[in-house]
A protein has these predicted regions:
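PRPP-associated nucleotide enzymes
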Residues: 1-276
Length: 276
């Protein structure tokens, strides 16, 4: 594709390489480093004048450092006269801070509009109030199977106070669907709830496997047959200590989204058609 360049931040270079390979391209040259005082320095190693630039940086690892690196890369490309800069963020940082809670800020919107929103093309990811329910019913409709819902109430982060199962799972294989799992207390509690309600097996399908703190130990000790995640976050090291984790590559979806954006085609087409 002419007049397009793809750069990778430090967070997930393997995924960036897969995206570039699927587009038949090489990643652009960029050097990222830190000064002795831990400030981030970015040097774009080739001309981006008049180019349609895509920067791949996932919200994982050292999240704040990687976020700052992304914002600096965006600014560097704009200063170098790129015609357009698009941030490709497979796992969106601060996504759990997407609504007003007491006196706290809406951090997901703040960094987007205050940072990458000035200079980078962005689509603000505001989801519906009951996004999880919509997601699971959509999957159930496609597979022509029944669905149940688990309602959870939290008193504080990473701690579920109450969980209620709505639906019948007796003598059925249960598939838990959620957007992300961090310490995995919630999904492990949900798995126990399903088994106690009569499910024969339990699988989990998650978009983002953060797996921090006691997550791996909890999964290993839980009743899951498998925990399936995408590769928005690197999982190689965690898979070595947790054989239940399975990873689905989504580079083809991100590559097609980039191609469609570059060519001015519909990206919403991908909501119902998955490229292979």
């Amino acid at each position: 594709m002419p007049n397009i360049k793809i750069f990778s931040g430090s967070s997930h270079r393997e995924l960036s390489h897969k995206i570039a390979d699927r587009l038949g391209m090489e990643l652009g040259k960029v050097v990222t480093k830190k000064f002795s005082n831990q400030e981030t320095c970015v040097e774009i190693g080739e001309s981006v004048r008049g180019e349609d630039v895509y920067i791949v940086q996932s919200g994982c690892g050292e999240i704040n450092d990687n976020l700052m690196e992304l914002l600096i890369m965006i600014n560097a490309c704009k200063i170098a006269s790129a015609s357009r800069v698009t941030a490709v963020i497979p796992c969106f940082p601060y996504a759990r801070q997407d609504k007003k809670d007491k006196s706290g800020p809406i951090s997901a919107n703040w960094w987007l509009t205050g940072g990458s929103g000035r200079g980078a093309k962005s689509n603000h990811p505001y989801g519906p109030l009951h996004a999880s329910q919509i997601r699971v019913t959509s999957i159930a409709d496609r597979l022509n199977v029944d669905f149940a819902l688990i309602h959870k109430e939290r008193k504080r982060a990473n701690e579920v106070d109450r969980m209620v199962l709505v639906g019948d799972v007796t003598d059925r294989v249960a598939i838990l669907v959620d957007d992300m799992a961090d310490t995995c207390g919630t999904i492990c509690h949900a798995a126990d709830k399903l088994i106690s309600a009569g499910a024969t097996k339990v699988y989990a399908i998650l978009t983002h496997g953060i797996f921090s703190g006691p997550a791996i130990s909890r999964i290993n000790n839980a009743c899951f047959e498998a925990v399936v995640v995408t590769n928005t976050i690197p999982q190689e090291e965690k898979m070595k200590t947790c054989p239940k984790i399975q990873v689905i590559d989504i580079s083809m979806i991100l590559a097609e989204a980039i191609r469609r954006t570059h060519n001015g085609e519909s990206v919403s087409y991908l909501f119902s058609h998955v490229p292979l």
